[in-house]
């Protein structure tokens, strides 16, 4: 409702995060849930870092709440009746949510080969004129011979070619057919470990590799862990922040996207979405407006409670 559709045909949505924060999990979780709801196929390109089996176990862990190591080892069968029932109960849902998911390892391929695979898959499996969600994990330099080009030039050309492919090359009479969601690593400015919230940089300056990534995308979000002080102040609002830094299209809740949020201490802050990451399962926990309302309610209750305390000073 705030930022509109993140999977508009012909558009690219980029998630920026440090390594290990959960950008792959977020993109795949979002794409597969949309796929299951609207019956749209998902093509997932992996850049040679995670196997198909690893992703399957992660998604199964997210749906069952059973630790990955139990699933990978097969010990879930020996972990009690409750665990066995949890795993078996989601088999049907797992097949339904991921029956339209296609995995392809493009590690070692140059950008032209990657786009060739995308086009061949689209025309052979999806069919001309039909919608496709394209999940690309993730933007980085390829192994091709780059000559005298800098890293930022190579990455810029990669994003440019993907944009032209989904915007211009593959389309029907009504327009583009492919929606793209991808991710990129942030630079060291985006590190949050051992930092207070006031010292964390939450803007597009943390995007690594090339400024063309920001230029060609329609939506850009920063995904990061909450700092220790944020977790202490916001205990019921998840473990991660999803912060929008660019939005070419907005949803019906425009105020939530562009207006600053007034906090109980009368300061103004940029809105963001709270996410709960637990065992590879992702749940939305409201936005900054919900945090402000919760803190205001708590402050009001404390003030009312203090006003009911009688004055015992008899002097």
Explain the meaning of each model-derived region.
Residues 65, 69-71, 81, 92, ...:
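C-terminal regions of RecA-like/P-loop NTPase motor modules
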Residues 2-3, 37-130, 257:
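Cytosolic-facing regulatory segments adjacent to core modules
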Residues 14, 103, 133-137, 181:
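Structural motif
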Residues 74-76, 144-156, 193-203:
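Flexible beta-alpha connector loops of hexameric P-loop NTPases
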Residues 47-49, 182-187, 226, 248:
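A short beta-strand-to-loop transition that corresponds to the Sensor-1 phosphate-sensing loop
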